[in-house]
Regions:
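Beta-strand-rich recognition/accessory modules
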Residues: 55-62, 146-147, 155-179, 188-192, ...
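Glycine- and small hydrophobic-enriched segments that form the cores of compact globular domains
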Residues: 71, 77-78, 82-87, 91-167, ...
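Hydrophobic beta-strand positions in extracellular immunoglobulin-like domains
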Residues: 184, 196-198, 323
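A short, polar/proline- and glycine-enriched secondary-structure boundary/capping micro-motif
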Residues: 90-93, 174-177, 203-206, 218-220, ...
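Polysaccharide-binding surfaces and accessory modules of carbohydrate-active proteins
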Residues: 189-192, 198-276
Length: 336
């Protein structure tokens, strides 16, 4: 019975509705795409209930783009990590069957700015002071070197559930060579992500190292509604934003909890040393069948941890983030 139910969910996901332009507008298109992910994850859930489930991390070129992806099939979620940007391009939470990495990117024709990179989770940038000032305002600021980089595999161990990637690029108009080593250690509840940013050249430089994550809209009751709640610990003091509808920038952050109020699922970030944070909702527009004027197609909540740094030639800095998915049944409480 479970296998039959799983097959029906797969059929629903494969009907092709997610690829059609609805006469109802572009926002319902997003809802249909999320429904397709939901049906796929539901099929996965049925199969897990029918046969013994074993957590795994595998490496294969699943989308036939010439580069391996890493598929993490864990107790609370499934995730796909791409070599492009070294980022999480799918994050399907088993509890509510949603894909939290299903985000658009801004296109100048419709959104008046170009992002020039894909908006997943754990997307890294290196910005100058001026670029970072624009970034915090949601303005065009370039791709930040690593968000468009093709990361290569340094080491993969499926048994240890460990992925090591390395990205390379150049910084500023001086073309300073820099590299970023990125280590994912995958567990049942989330990830530990370790970074080593290195100045590969002889010239010292300073900047901001930014780790960006984008959370897709799951509440479709209102196109421009932000359904995420934000809780922070800044310099030992708790700060809460019931709906973070405006940009938020804070420093001395040791704890971040982003909660999807439509499902009560939380995502917790705990950096190994205090960081800054920049958060804001972003609206994406696309044309629909009934109007040449772009309409709201999606609302994404963007949260970025950042650190200022100075790097002499040949030197490096290390940062680590623990990322935990908390479902309603087992919620960790922390005084804030």
């Amino acid at each position: 019975a479970r296998k039959m139910a799983a097959r029906k969910s797969l059929w629903k996901a494969q009907t092709g509705e997610a690829f059609l332009c609805s006469p109802e507008g572009v926002f319902p298109d997003k809802k249909m795409r999320q429904a397709a992910y939901k049906n796929l994850t539901e099929a996965e859930k049925y199969i897990r209930e029918a046969v013994p489930f074993k957590e795994s991390v595998t490496s294969f070129d699943y989308n036939a783009d010439g580069h391996n992806e890493y598929l993490c099939s864990m107790e609370k979620y499934t995730a796909c990590i791409s070599a492009r940007g070294g980022q999480i391009t799918e994050l399907n939470v088993i509890h509510n069957l949603e894909n939290y990495a299903d985000n658009l990117s801004r296109i100048e024709k419709f959104d008046k700015v170009n992002d020039n990179y894909e908006r997943g989770l754990f997307v890294e940038h290196v910005f100058s002071k001026e670029e970072f000032s624009d970034y915090k305002k949601g303005l065009p600021s370039g791709c930040g070197v690593f968000s468009k980089a093709l990361f290569r595999e340094a080491e993969f161990n499926g048994t240890k559930k460990e992925i090591k990637l390395k990205g390379e690029g150049t910084y500023s108009n001086l073309d300073i060579p820099i590299s970023l080593r990125k280590r994912y250690l995958i567990n049942s509840n989330g990830f530990m992500v370790q970074y080593i940013l290195k100045n590969e050249g002889p010239i010292a430089f300073s900047g901001n190292f930014v780790v960006e994550s984008n959370f897709a809209q799951t509440d479709f009751s209102n196109a421009d509604k932000n359904s995420y709640k934000l809780d922070l610990i800044s310099d030992g003091n708790g700060i809460s934003y019931e709906t973070a509808d405006e940009p938020v920038v804070k420093k001395d952050i040791s704890f971040v909890q982003i909660t999807d109020t439509s499902s009560n699922i939380s995502f917790v970030y705990e950096p190994n040393e205090e960081a800054g944070i920049s958060c804001q909702p972003l609206l994406f527009k696309r044309p629909d069948l009934n109007s040449e004027t772009p309409q709201i197609a999606e609302n994404t909540f963007t949260a970025s941890l950042f650190w200022e740094f100075d790097l002499a030639g040949g030197m490096e800095i290390e940062k680590t983030i623990n990322f935990t998915i908390i479902t309603p049944k087992k919620r960790r409480t922390k005084k804030i």
